[in-house]
Design a protein with these regions (language model features):
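Flavin-dependent oxidoreductase catalytic cores
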Residues: 1-186
Length: 186
């Protein structure tokens, strides 16, 4: 499997981005025990462009972690582009956009999985971020907003047309949050 120029082998093991979990020490431990690629905690684009020190610390990566991705989330195109450029300066191997977080403080404000209710804006942000940076851009999202709006097949094609290097699909809708059985049939 390749993402951009990064060859991850035939069946790579990924350490997903997890808030308050995937700090540098945890990422290094997971690399030691076989993770082929690791992600930082997700980073708020708004906090990043305001230079919030706790957020900036999430950009600290080391060569021992490589390949490593930094994941950002937000709802404003200009803010996401500015944040993407800041992230690129931290020299990750991949920039990942989170359109999958279902929690109210993110999705309720229109970011993360909240973007599943505004697909044109999601695509606008994705295109703008892809065009703004030189590193591969990937996206993480869900099957759709709810059981009546599972749009992932069409959405995947649209995101591919925006130029993303890879797509991670959470096998649940936003309405499911992290409960119920994941749908792996897509």
């Amino acid at each position: 499997m390749k993402i951009g120029h990064i060859d991850l082998g035939e069946r790579p093991i990924f350490l997903a981005p997890m808030e308050d979990v995937t700090d540098p020490a945890f990422r290094l431990m997971c690399k030691k025990f076989g993770a082929d690629m690791v992600y930082t905690e997700f980073v708020s684009a708004d906090a990043l462009i305001r230079s919030v020190s706790k957020t900036e610390q999430k950009l600290n990566i080391s060569d021992e972690e490589r390949p490593v991705a930094i994941q950002i989330y937000g709802k404003d195109t200009e803010t996401m582009v500015e944040a993407a450029r800041i992230v690129e300066e931290a020299r990750p191997d991949i920039l990942d956009i989170n359109f999958g977080c279902p929690v109210k403080r993110v999705a309720g404000k229109g970011a993360g999985a909240g973007m599943l209710q505004n697909i044109p804006k999601m695509l606008e942000i994705t295109r703008a971020v892809v065009d703004a940076v030189k590193i591969p851009v990937t996206v993480k999202t869900r099957l759709g907003w709810d059981a009546n709006n599972k749009i992932i097949v069409e959405l995947a094609e649209q995101l591919q047309d925006c130029g993303i290097a890879a797509l991670t699909i959470l096998g649940r809708t936003r309405a499911q949050m992290d409960t119920g059985e994941a749908d792996g049939t897509v």
